[in-house]
Regions:
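Basic, amphipathic "hinge/linker" alpha-helix immediately C-terminal to the N-terminal HTH DNA-binding motif
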Residues: 75-94
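Long, compositionally biased intrinsically disordered regions
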Residues: 1-3, 23, 119
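Amphipathic alpha-helical dimerization/coiled-coil segments
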Residues: 92-119
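Basic amphipathic alpha-helical segments that dock to polyanions
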Residues: 25, 55-65
């Protein structure tokens, strides 16, 4: 897969996530959500419709990997929440990205500015 990225959520454990799956984890880092809310946020990000046939199998894969927890809200609606392992996978990915991007003080300042703006 061309979208694949490798992240390690624990020493010795390697997770292969697509960019789409990574984006789901990022969305769930805000708060637990049901599937259609995740779908809407992905559509906003991508600027195009996200097919149910793409979303739900990816959510199921993330649940199977232990990065997302699935719970039943009612008979028809499931809620998805980021697990501690999923959160750690996001931190590991950010750490790796920052280690490659931050090559001098100016770039470090740029990232500090981004982080400050997000607060």
């Amino acid at each position: 897969m061309s979208e694949a990225q490798t992240v390690s959520s624990e020493p010795g454990i390697v997770r292969d996530l697509t960019a789409f799956q990574h984006n789901i984890l990022v969305i769930l880092s805000e708060e637990p959500m049901y599937g259609l809310a995740i779908k809407r946020q992905l559509e906003e990000y991508y600027g195009t419709e996200v097919n149910h046939g793409r979303l739900y199998p990816n959510l199921d894969d993330l649940v199977e990997m232990g990065l997302v927890e699935k719970s039943e809200l009612d008979k028809r609606t499931n809620q998805y929440a980021l697990t501690e392992e999923g959160y750690q996978a996001l931190l590991d990915q950010l750490s790796w990205t920052f280690s490659k991007v931050v090559t001098d003080e100016e770039r470090a300042a740029d990232l500090e500015e981004l982080i400050g703006a997000a607060r």
